[in-house]
């Protein structure tokens, strides 16, 4: 039959084991010696004792050490709230060690060693206690050590934990607002959707409070017409005082607020989310199609405009061609007239040359006649 030995066991075995541990671990000199250094032997440190005894960790090693058990030369360290079931064995072989008591006992032993092993200086004088008695190291005995250890153990003992009160059952209550006649469901003594005036304690819902104080510096109660600068909003921890700081009039702000609520604060529904995503995708596709139709219409209008420009340019080109043909005809006519005139000019030049030759011959003949007549 297994036995569970922990802090909640209502038996005297734990107290007896702790008492045995105290008697075994408490050190006090039995007989006074001339010099404390010659009578006291160095006590083994806890590290040396743990090195000779195998240790086992029960629970999380990172949690604080709660208790230790020594069973058959094996040490079991219980951390945190872990449960420990010692193996079936004789009760006398199970030694329970409270970690806090062990630390207090070690501090008492170290204090006793410092008092008994410190050599007196040449200027030593007894220490006077507040009661007027002179305390000397020679007056210490084992009873003083036991009383000091008991006092340290009592001081280091953990205070008893008071049981936490059971949480109150939550009750949903419907509360009516006298201004907007809306009903709100709140948890009684836990939260509230209503705001009360600090003057009259008349309650209104939060949306009515916002409507009343909007663009005002003070809150005026709609029931008793009292005016106050602050109102109170309550929850299970207390209340918060509210006052108007600044008011901004913009109809787009509530739309932005609801857009944020729609994106972040709506209850999650997978089918609804898929439908909304498909609707958004359909809206995007419709917008893309509309933009594509608009671009096609713009391209068609641009094409028509370009076609008109091409037709106009073709008309201008035809006009230029007609003008070119007309000018070519005029050029041909002028060329023919020029050729005719050039031929006439050439004929006249030839005729003039013939006449000039005749004139020269006639002139030479006349000169000969004149010379012959003169002679």
UniProtKB/Swiss-Prot annotation:
Coiled coil: 272-348
Record keywords: Coiled coil, Early protein, Host nucleus, Host-virus interaction, Metal-binding, Modulation of host ubiquitin pathway by viral E3 ligase, Modulation of host ubiquitin pathway by virus, Transferase, Ubl conjugation, Ubl conjugation pathway, Zinc, Zinc-finger
Compositionally biased tracts (Polar residues): 1-12
Disulphide-bridged cysteine pairs: none
Top-level taxon: Viruses
GO molecular function: transferase activity; zinc ion binding
ZnF (RING-type) ranges: 177-225
Reported modifications of this chain: Auto-ubiquitinated.
Protein name: E3 ubiquitin-protein ligase IE2
Organism: Hyphantria cunea nuclear polyhedrosis virus (HcNPV)
Lineage: Viruses, Viruses incertae sedis, Naldaviricetes, Lefavirales, Baculoviridae
